[in-house]
């Protein structure tokens, strides 16, 4: 097992909090203190698409456009959006592997069973001194509410 079982699902305080989280995920914050030459190794997935979006292959300006578009699309839903950062506590692993990917899929299925649906998944591989981790943006869909 690679990841902690104790995954805390957090609620956004407001739209600004949501925007800050997206900046962290997309590495588009103004300070750029986490962006480095390894940032293109990060991966970004949307909903049920198993293919990397390639957003981290883009330069900062283009990533900001993508992030802002995503924010514009989702910022009115912040009242039912949540987020989680899932850590790998093992200090001997810094690169993702296929087994971690499978475990991540299992975690995502478990969240869906609890009515939290992944909208965006970002794997950060650009912090070699930090543990492997991934971020999930989740949309909670209450099963008791008729749409």
Report residues per predicted region.
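Positively charged, glycine-rich low-complexity segments
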Residues: 1-132, 138-147
């Amino acid at each position: 097992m690679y990841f902690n079982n104790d995954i805390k699902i957090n609620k956004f305080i407001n739209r600004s909090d949501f925007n800050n989280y997206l900046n962290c995920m997309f590495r588009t914050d103004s300070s750029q203190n986490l962006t480095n030459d390894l940032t293109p190794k990060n991966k970004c997935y949307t909903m049920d698409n198993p293919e990397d979006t390639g957003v981290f292959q883009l330069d900062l300006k283009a990533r900001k456009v993508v992030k802002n578009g995503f924010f514009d699309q989702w910022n009115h839903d912040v009242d039912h959006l949540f987020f989680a950062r899932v850590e790998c506590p093992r200090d001997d692993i810094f690169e993702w592997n296929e087994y971690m990917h499978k475990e991540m899929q299992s975690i995502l299925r478990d969240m869906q069973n609890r009515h939290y649906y992944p909208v965006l998944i970002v794997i950060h591989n650009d912090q070699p001194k930090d543990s492997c981790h991934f971020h999930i943006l989740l949309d909670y869909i209450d099963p008791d509410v008729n749409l």
